[in-house]
Amino acid sequence: KGITPVRIAHRLGQHSDDLRTKPLIIYLNDSTTGITKSILNKPPLELNLLNRTKGSAYYEDDILITEPFDFSSKNYFPISSQHNLLKRVIFPQNFDKSERFNLSDEQQEYLLSAMHTVPRKAGYDPKTYYDGYCKFFIYGDTKENIPEYLEIYNKVGFAYGTLTDCAYIKDTEKNIDFLLTATILVNKDGIFNDDAYEYDEIGIPFLAQLGREIYQQELKRK
């Protein structure tokens, strides 16, 4: 779709570096329609990037390794690529057919609804999963409900001390809208995989304030 650079080299979670793709059973209306074959993939090439190692140490299997963490075999999806992908999701009509995702109107509507829906409207306890739980921009550092007139279509990520939000924000009352993508690393001790990241103390408040600042700029530009 013309989105570069992107490199998806491994799964998420346990055994993410397993090169064998397990077979998938495909169901339709409780009936099996097909089974895919197991595939043995090639090992990923090292990323040709600067600063592929970060920090001063990391944990592996509960053992502290006192050397920088190597990200050269990890997935690579920079925020420039995320931002360009979001544009195609929100404004497909602005792109050539070859650059659009092959989604039906129903699929497009479902995707946007999933990106916009806050946890309480999906049946989750709002005391635990408040509106800003996965809406870092503007509301990430508050447990207030997001007003109905402010629509946030986004996808967040957090791993290895890095927080990312990629969002389309639309105020239907003030008649303003904007796209915003940002990422921040919060790993004060320089140790990866120790679960001691400053997400709540630094990362989320920073992204929330960034969203508010850009929102205010858009109000002034209007």
Where are these regions (language model features)?
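Active-site-adjacent helix/loop patches that line small-molecule binding or acyl-intermediate pockets
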Residues: K1-S98
